[in-house]
């Protein structure tokens, strides 16, 4: 009996089958793109850095149902995949697999290819042996490794089909490296990914590390998006002068194109780095003060514009940071919890399906 139980738990890979991820339910995209694993076709006005970030798959997901006991992926990188750095390898070039249990998304497995060179297929197992029967699955893609092609690997002869949309509505989240996910240990641990799983609403990652500065071309692009709401992490990157100059034109551009669509701005977070660095503390405080001043004016002037000031990624123990500026995965959980109630209260006023 012991031997039989051991054999039942071993990896089941023998013969395999490969399903193009594009034939399943692909979600998390705000814009249609020429290349499927990019978030937006690069805009002419973008800097070279922003054009590179536009090609990242952060926030993209694949939903599918399968009765396979083993599940993996086969990926071809579009460019040399990063080793990790601030992200860690699972967040940078890995994949997070979730499955539904008792109506909630639960982590099921993850992994990342050791190989980083582009142009060759690399295969990894995410879960070698899971429960019998049909599983509702959600696969989160790498945050910063550019993907050329992706296939879901399952047992040969198993059934795999597109899954239902995992979350309702379409809510664009434009922001900084915090929104992109810098410092997260896994690709499913950005604050907006956690907010989606916690609420059932579809918060879509449009983070541009270091480059969320209320640029007019981002406003023009977002104004064309087919969305039910916007959330903006808009004050983590720009200087107070940029906020004062750019905020109202940014709002006006989107409001003109999307009247009646809620625009929710959230305050930036405090950084642990400020604890022993007075100059850095003054820098962050000046940003927050200008953001608060301007947003109080904007919420009075424009309908359906909201200001959420409860954002926090600081733990009671001050142990939720990856580098003094960016939260770690736990810090992003705290961020999500800090804004969940006010954001959902605002969204409850609107019909989001």
Predicted features, each with a name:
Residues 223, 271-353:
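Catalytic His-Asp segment of secreted/periplasmic serine-dependent ester chemistry enzymes
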Residues 170-173, 203-206, 228-233, 262-266, ...:
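Structural recognition of the beta-strand scaffold that forms the well-ordered cores
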Residues 6-170, 340, 347-353:
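N-terminal secretory targeting modules
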Residues 178-185, 237-240, 322:
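Second-shell loop/turn segments in exported
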Residues 195, 212-248, 253, 268-274:
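Oxyanion-hole/transition-state-stabilizing segment in secreted/luminal serine hydrolases
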Residues 83-86, 181-189, 282-285:
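Glycine- and acidic-residue-enriched helix-capping/strand-helix junction motifs
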Residues 4, 128-131, 137-212, 216-224:
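Serine-esterase "nucleophile elbow" of acetyl-processing enzymes
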Residues 191, 246, 250, 287-294:
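A general structural detector for well-ordered alpha-helical segments in enzyme core domains, enriched
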